[in-house]
Swiss-Prot record:
One of its GO terms (molecular function) is ferrous iron binding. GO terms for biological process: D-glucuronate catabolic process. Keywords: Iron, Lyase, Manganese. Its cofactor is Fe(2+); Mn(2+). Its EC number is 4.2.1.8. It comes from the Bacteria. Belongs to the mannonate dehydratase family. It holds the Pfam family UxuA. This is Mannonate dehydratase. Catalyzes the dehydration of D-mannonate. The keyword Transport does not apply. It catalyses: D-mannonate = 2-dehydro-3-deoxy-D-gluconate + H2O.
Length: 394
C-alpha cells in the first residue's frame, strides 16, 4: 500500500517536513480555501502540488472535492455546481492527480460529541456518546420530531444528562457537534444548523438516492474519461442522525453504488473506522467483495461501549475492527492488480490518532495530531510487512 498522510495545507500545525519524517510518501490534501462549488483552477492545483513536491512528497489523493449542499438537495444552482465539479475533475487530471475521495453526507461531514475523551493511559480520543447526542438533539437543538428517534429509556437518560449540564457544557457539546470539524467545510450556529436540517425534511432516503444517482451518472463518466478514480467515503457514523437521510453505510449501500453506475471509476474509500461502528458490517467481507473498487483506505478502529450506539476511537490495531484481515484483504487485491499489470498502489492513511505525548501540550486539529498518527502509520507499516512475508512473498 502507498503510505499517505492527510495534510490540511499551509496552516496545518503538522508540517510537510514532519510528514516526510513519519515515513509517508503521499499527501492527502484539498484546496480548503476555495468555496464549496467553485472550480479548482489548474493554477491553484499546480500551486499546491508544487509546495508538496518541493518537500519531497507526492499529492496522491484529493480529500475532498466537496459536494455542494444544493447538489444533495437538488435545489438552486445544483446543475451549475455539478458542471463546476466536472471541470475540477478535468483540471485535477490535467495536473496528474488520479484519486478523489468525497462524501454525500448531508450537512455534517462527521460527528462526535467529545473531541478530547481521556483514555486510561492519559491520551485523548474522539468519542460519540449516544446519550449526550440525544441530550443535544432533544434539549439543546430541540429538533421537531427528534423524540421519535429515541427509546423511552434513552429519552430518560438524555434528560438526566441534560439536567446536569452547565452552560459551559452546553456550549462545548454544541460546538463539538455543529461548529465544523477538520474536513467539514462549514460551521453553523444553532439557528443556521436547524435551517440546514429543515432543507432535508421532505427528502426520504429513497429520494436522496435519486439525487445521488443523478450526481453519479453526471460525474462518474467524466472521471472515467479523464482517468480519475472516485472513492466515496461512508457516512460517519454509518446510521441516520438528526432526521437526515444517510445512504452510504452498509454492504447493501455499496452494492447499490455499483449497480447504479457500473463504471470502474465509481469506487470506494474503505474507511474501517466509519463502517466499523456498526456491528452488522463485516469489514473483511466488504473489502473482499468490493476490492476491485476500493481506491483509498482509511485505517482506523473504534470501540463500541456498553450502549452499542456509543463508541470511541481505539488505538489503530485494537478495538472492534479486524485490522489484520482487512489489511490482508487489501493486500490480496493489490497483488491481484499487480498480476494484471496495474502499478498503482492502494493509498492508505492512518485515519485519526490519539492525542498523546508532546501533542497533549499543543493545539491540534481533533483527530489529526502528529504523534498518534505516526504511531498508527508505523503499526500499519509493520503489519503490512509481516503479512507480505508470510502470505505473499514466499
Amino acid at each position: 500500500m502507498e503510505q499517505t498522510w492527510r495534510w490540511y495545507g499551509p496552516n496545518d500545525p503538522v508540517s510537510l517536513a514532519d510528514i516526510r519524517q513519519a515515513g509517508a510518501t503521499g499527501i492527502v490534501n484539498a484546496l480548503h480555501h476555495i468555496p464549496n462549488g467553485q472550480v479548482w483552477s489548474v493554477e491553484e492545483i499546480e500551486k499546491r502540488k508544487a509546495i508538496i513536491e518541493a518537500a519531497g512528497l507526492t499529492w496522491s489523493v484529493v480529500e475532498s472535492v466537496p459536494v455542494h449542499e444544493e447538489i444533495k438537495t437538488q435545489t438552486g444552482n445544483y446543475k451549475t455546481w455539478i458542471e463546476n465539479y466536472k471541470q475540477t475533475l478535468r483540471n485535477l487530471a490535467q495536473c496528474g492527480i488520479d484519486t478523489v475521495c468525497y462524501n454525500f453526507m448531508p450537512v455534517l461531514d462527521w460527528t462526535r460529541t467529545d473531541l478530547a475523551y481521556e483514555l486510561p493511559d492519559g491520551s485523548k480520543a474522539l468519542r460519540f456518546d449516544q446519550i449526550a447526542f440525544a441530550a443535544f438533539e432533544l434539549h439543546i437543538l430541540k429538533r421537531p420530531g427528534a423524540e421519535q428517534t429515541y427509546t423511552a429509556e434513552e429519552q430518560k437518560q438524555a434528560k438526566a444528562y441534560f439536567d446536569k449540564m452547565s452552560d459551559a457544557d452546553i456550549k462545548q457539546l454544541t460546538s463539538n457537534i455543529i461548529a465544523g470539524l477538520p474536513g467539514a467545510e462549514e460551521g453553523y450556529t444553532l439557528e443556521e444548523f436547524q435551517g440546514q436540517l429543515d432543507r432535508y425534511k421532505d427528502i426520504s432516503p429513497e429520494k436522496f438516492r435519486t439525487h445521488l444517482a443523478y450526481f453519479l451518472n453526471e460525474i462518474i463518466p467524466v472521471a472515467q474519461e479523464v482517468g480519475i478514480k472516485m472513492a466515496v467515503h461512508p457516512d460517519d457514523p454509518p446510521r441516520p442522525i438528526l432526521g437526515l437521510p444517510r445512504i452510504v453505510s452498509t454492504i447493501e449501500d455499496m452494492q447499490w453504488y455499483v449497480d447504479t453506475c457500473d463504471l470502474p471509476a465509481n469506487g470506494f474509500t474503505m474507511c474501517t473506522g466509519s463502517y466499523g461502528v456498526r456491528a452488522d458490517n463485516d469489514l473483511v467481507k466488504m473489502t473482499e467483495k468490493f476490492g476491485d473498487r476500493i481506491y483509498f483506505a482509511h485505517l482506523r478502529s473504534t470501540c463500541r461501549e456498553d450502549n452499542p450506539l456509543t463508541f470511541h476511537e481505539a488505538a489503530h490495531l485494537q478495538g472492534d475492527v479486524d485490522m489484520f484481515n482487512v489489511v490482508k484483504a487489501l493486500l490480496t487485491e493489490e497483488y491481484r492488480r499487480k498480476a494484471n499489470g496495474e502499478t498503482r498502489l492502494i493509498p492508505m492513511r492512518p485515519d485519526h490518532g490519539h492525542q498523546m505525548l508532546d501533542d497533549l501540550k499543543k493545539k491540534t486539529n481533533p483527530g489529526y495530531s502528529a504523534i498518534g498518527r505516526l504511531k498508527g502509520l508505523a503499526e500499519f507499516r509493520g503489519l503490512e510487512m509481516a503479512l507480505k512475508k508470510v502470505f505473499f512473498e514466499k
